[in-house]
Amino acid sequence: LIDEEIAKGSKGQIVIKANSVTDRELIDKFSEASCAGVKIILIIRGICCILPNIHGKTDNVMVNSIVGRFLEHSRIYSFGTGEDQKLYIGSADIMTRNQDRRTEIACPIKSPEIKAFINRYIRRSLQDNVNRRVMLPNGEYAMPDSKGKDPFDVQEYYLSHAIHLSKSKTHDKSHHKIKYEAKDKMQDKKLNLSFFDKFFKRSKKK
């Protein structure tokens, strides 16, 4: 999958959400992809042994970390964009123990609706300016630039949405869900998956 994105060059894209990145072989592969022009966006809550924005190595790698109210364990692996996107969910981190010493299973997402939902979740995670931190080339973390933006906590967003639905009557739930999905679909049509490309470019300018 990484090789497929490398073959696309600057049109390639990899987005991964996991707890840790420590496997040297895959880190080297990410570096190879970065050198080929592939945009790599990582959302890694804990240990991350790849340094972003190192000239000639990881110029096209961005590392984010979100540590909020809830201890999340979701793993998402996305390769490519648009109709060519291959999206998986699973339980494996990018660690040697997962890659070499365990039998891990990743589930491909075929449903367009579920794929869109997961893409929106990733997009909103990257818009978090309360708990998200961005790794610097020296390995330290800094808050993203949120000047002129309202505070946005992705975990609180999904929590408040779930609470709102749970308090609604059955018919109201359906109505709200339709309005909610219509709004999201409109955003998807407007932003498509080019959001990640625009997000990456904005972040690189800072």
Regions found by a protein language model. Name each.
Residues 1-206:
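PLD/PLD-like phosphodiesterase catalytic module centered on the HKD motif
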